[in-house]
């Protein structure tokens, strides 16, 4: 696996010698704007593979995206290869409909240490919950970013990531009450500990997320990519976009239902994805939100 091929895939052309916060931020932002957070393979009858070589081939060579077990695994590898001090961590996603965190460790994230300061780096949460900058591992501190205000809180060795969101404007009244629209201004995202993990720790959940009827990845097809102004998502056959702060403290959220032909075109033009097999969009009871 070639780190230069990775840099080309994410469009990163700047310094690889300065292992500082600015470089870390640039790599994160290049990856999140080049590599979609998506589960389309599952809805094309293909498996989501866990191994690093398979992930590199899928994302770098085939120019696809993936979910956190792939996308953040690749980021972890790249940052380590560059010389950053990295630790793989595992997270428990907050499940809004049941108001609790997942019982299984379903999210992979990365800790990076720079000059004795620890940062959380995550390029694979997707939608409008995606951080645009590394988060300093400090409890109780509001960390404003373009998407929202993020806050990390530590309690008895467990860290909690929350998000404080803006007001939102939805011009298409048909979708004002849609289950695709995030309606909370204060949003719990996930919890995690600082216990080091390996990719093997995620083998069970990699299978579970692809097979369990309780998995949102089984219920709904999803593709999300950050842009310079916000984020675009394809949820089932609905194209959604959120433009951050399009006016003072208000996000613009737009929705459009797509035909089968339009979906193929949008995947290519908006997300840079050309699928090899037939894609069957799915919007079940369990959905992602924008």
From Swiss-Prot:
One of its GO terms (cellular component) is cytoplasm. It is found in: Cytoplasm. The keyword DNA damage does not apply. The modification N-acetylmethionine is found at residue 1. GO terms for molecular function: arylamine N-acetyltransferase activity. Pfam families: Acetyltransf_2. It is an enzyme of class 2 (transferase). One of its GO terms (biological process) is response to thyroxine. Substrate binds at residues 106-107. CoA binds at residues 103, 208. Disulfide bonds: none annotated. The keyword Acetylation applies. Its EC number is 2.3.1.5. Keywords: Acetylation, Acyltransferase, Cytoplasm, Transferase. It comes from the Eukaryota. It catalyses: an arylamine + acetyl-CoA = an N-acetylarylamine + CoA. The active site is at 68 (acyl-thioester intermediate), 107, 122. Participates in the detoxification of a plethora of hydrazine and arylamine drugs. Acetylates both arylamines and arylalkylamines. Belongs to the arylamine N-acetyltransferase family. This is Arylamine N-acetyltransferase 1. It comes from Rattus norvegicus (Rat). The gene is Nat1.
């Amino acid at each position: 696996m070639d780190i230069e091929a990775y840099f080309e895939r994410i469009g990163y052309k700047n310094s690889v010698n300065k292992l500082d916060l600015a470089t870390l931020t640039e790599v994160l932002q290049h990856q999140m704007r080049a590599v979609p957070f998506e589960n389309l393979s599952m809805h094309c009858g293909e498996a989501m593979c866990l191994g690093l070589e398979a992930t590199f081939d899928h994302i770098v060579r085939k120019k696809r995206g993936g979910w956190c077990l792939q996308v953040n695994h690749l980021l972890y590898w790249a940052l380590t290869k560059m010389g950053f001090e990295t630790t793989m961590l595992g997270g428990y996603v907050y499940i809004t409909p049941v108001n609790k965190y997942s019982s299984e460790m379903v999210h992979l994230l990365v800790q990076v240490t720079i000059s004795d300061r620890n940062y959380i780096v995550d390029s694979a949460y997707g939608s409008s919950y995606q951080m645009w900058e590394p988060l300093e591992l400090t409890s109780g501190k509001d960390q404003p970013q373009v998407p929202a205000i993020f806050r990390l809180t530590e309690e008895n060795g467990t860290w909690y990531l929350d998000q404080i969101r803006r007001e939102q404007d939805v011009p298409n009244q048909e979708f004002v009450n849609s289950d695709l629209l995030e309606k909370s201004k204060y949003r719990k995202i996930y919890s995690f500990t600082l216990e080091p993990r390996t990719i093997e720790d995620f083998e069970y959940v990699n299978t579970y997320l692809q097979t369990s009827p309780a998995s949102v990845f089984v219920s709904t097809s999803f593709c999300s990519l950050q842009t310079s102004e916000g984020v675009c998502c394809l949820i089932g056959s609905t194209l959604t976009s959120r433009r951050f702060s399009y006016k003072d403290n208000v996000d613009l959220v737009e929705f459009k239902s797509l035909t089968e032909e339009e979906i193929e075109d949008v995947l290519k033009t908006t997300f840079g994805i050309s699928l090899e097999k037939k894609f069957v969009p799915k919007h079940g009871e369990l959905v992602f939100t924008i």
